[in-house]
Amino acid sequence: FLNQSPQFYKQTAVAFFDRVFEIAPVYRAEKHATSRHINEYIGLDFEMGYIDSMYDVMAMETACLRYVMEYLKKHYAFELELLEADVPVIRDIPSVTLLEAKEILGNKGSKNKLDLEPEDEVAICEYAKKTFDSDFIFVTHFPSSKPPFYAMNSREDPRLAYKFDLLFRGLEITSGGQRIHDYQEQLDKMHA
């Protein structure tokens, strides 16, 4: 299989550099039959050390997106107008837990308890636009059985993980979370 991400190298490097950024080709090594995924793309990854919670990562992502959108509007106004691109204004990005998202969806949502299906993502983004006037929304606290083994389980409820997805206009555009930083805890989760 092709590597999807140098995840562990980045996590190791954080011990020395505090923040590690990478822009590189990503090759998906998973089966999927959807127009919502591509097998190869250029990805931007970052790891942060010495955080208190996944909300620190979400705040960093919000600030980064805000900067990029403002930069695009300032330096590429002609191109954006030519393409008739609608660049969103980013204030604070709202968040809901997966459980809250499922409650918002009610009977209209999918039966998948571990994740959101594409139609769920569209509906949650419509909710975010209507309720918060935001094109973006974070969905947090997925079941701990879903994310990769390096995602930290919630201290309040170990059945959940400190993991999030960022949705934008009906699509998941990023995912992230708080990593396990305790050696024994990591070993225990790997062996579970």
Which positions does each model-derived feature cover?
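Extended C-terminal subregions enriched in glycine
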Residues: 169-192
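Short conserved micro-motifs at the rims of enzyme active sites and ligand-binding pockets
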Residues: 13-15, 33-36, 55-58, 149-152, ...
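Hydrophobic (often cysteine-bearing) scaffold residues that line and stabilize catalytic clefts
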Residues: 57-61, 97, 182
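A generic structural motif
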Residues: 45-56, 170-172
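Beta-sheet entry/capping signal
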Residues: 1, 18-20, 135-138, 172
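Class II aminoacyl-tRNA synthetase-like tRNA-binding/catalytic domains
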Residues: 1-49
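Metal-assisted phosphate- and nucleotidyl-transfer catalytic regions
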Residues: 63-169, 191-192
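Conserved hydrophobic/aromatic pocket- or pore-lining residues that grip, position, or stack substrates
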Residues: 2, 46, 101, 139, ...
